[in-house]
């Protein structure tokens, strides 16, 4: 009879412990319900990138001296620099400059070590295409400045600094973002 009583006591203690664990996990879940949403509606809302963001590379053809430093510091020898030696002036003349963004790892070494600052990183990150050969940008495509996300009136920009206000009087299933 005595082992049966201790068995019931152990069962009761285990039941109380399980109920406490369930209650703790439920309280954690409820504490997360008060947080603001983290996700954004991507095509219509875009986060503003930071200053140090490494996006598509912008190239200025007139500043380049064809020194090929960018090729030497690139971990995968990616930039293709075609030049010829102009015998009259004894200088290199740049003919073609291209980067394949399908292979580029966006490390930023080429931008950092360029002596003439003809390379710079932009905030453009939407480089997806259906054909991988379209990711090979020549000096004309690299020279185009991307449209800034801030200047595009069709896109609502959001930052991590401004909190999004959520209507409190609506039920949880139909929360809407208010300005």
UniProtKB/Swiss-Prot annotation:
> Can you give the residue ranges of the 4Fe-4S ferredoxin-type domain?
55-84, 95-124
Gene Ontology molecular function terms on file: 4 iron, 4 sulfur cluster binding; iron ion binding; NADH dehydrogenase (ubiquinone) activity; quinone binding
Q: Which reaction does it catalyse?
A: a plastoquinone + NADH + (n+1) H(+)(in) = a plastoquinol + NAD(+) + n H(+)(out); a plastoquinone + NADPH + (n+1) H(+)(in) = a plastoquinol + NADP(+) + n H(+)(out)
The compartments listed are: Plastid, Chloroplast thylakoid membrane
Q: Which PROSITE patterns match?
A: 4FE4S_FER_1, 4FE4S_FER_2
Positions contributing to [4Fe-4S] cluster 1 binding: 64, 67, 70, 114
Query: Which keywords does this Swiss-Prot/TrEMBL entry list?
Result: 4Fe-4S, Chloroplast, Iron, Iron-sulfur, Membrane, Metal-binding, NAD, NADP, Plastid, Plastoquinone, Quinone, Repeat, Thylakoid, Translocase
Q: Which cofactor does it need?
A: [4Fe-4S] cluster
Q: Where does [4Fe-4S] cluster 2 bind?
A: 74, 104, 107, 110
**Methyltransferase in keyword set:** no
Quote the Gene3D superfamilies the UniProt record gives. 3.30.70.3270
**What does the subunit section of this Swiss-Prot or TrEMBL entry state?**
NDH is composed of at least 16 different subunits, 5 of which are encoded in the nucleus.
**Job description of the protein:** NDH shuttles electrons from NAD(P)H:plastoquinone, via FMN and iron-sulfur (Fe-S) centers, to quinones in the photosynthetic chain and possibly in a chloroplast respiratory chain. The immediate electron acceptor for the enzyme in this species is believed to be plastoquinone. Couples the redox reaction to proton translocation, and thus conserves the redox energy in a proton gradient.
Q: What is this protein called?
A: NAD(P)H-quinone oxidoreductase subunit I, chloroplastic
Q: Source species, please?
A: Acorus calamus
- What high-level taxonomic lineage is stated for the organism? Eukaryota, Viridiplantae, Streptophyta, Embryophyta, Tracheophyta
């Amino acid at each position: 009879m005595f082992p049966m009583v201790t068995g019931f006591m152990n069962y009761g203690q285990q039941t109380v412990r399980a109920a406490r664990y369930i209650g703790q996990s439920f309280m954690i879940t409820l504490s997360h319900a008060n947080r603001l949403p983290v996700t954004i509606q991507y095509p219509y809302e875009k986060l503003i990138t930071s200053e140090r963001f490494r996006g598509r590379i912008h190239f200025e053809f007139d500043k380049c001296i064809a020194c090929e430093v960018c090729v030497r510091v690139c971990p995968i020898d990616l930039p293709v620099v075609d030049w010829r030696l102009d015998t009259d002036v004894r200088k290199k003349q740049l003919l073609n400059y291209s980067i394949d963004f399908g292979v580029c790892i966006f490390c930023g070494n080429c931008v950092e070590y360029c002596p003439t600052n003809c390379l710079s990183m932009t905030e453009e990150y939407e480089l997806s295409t259906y054909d991988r050969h379209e990711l090979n940008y020549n000096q004309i495509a690299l020279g185009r400045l991307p449209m800034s996300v801030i200047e595009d009136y069709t896109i609502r920009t959001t930052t991590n600094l401004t909190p999004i206000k959520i209507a409190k009087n609506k039920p949880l299933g139909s929360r809407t973002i208010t300005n």
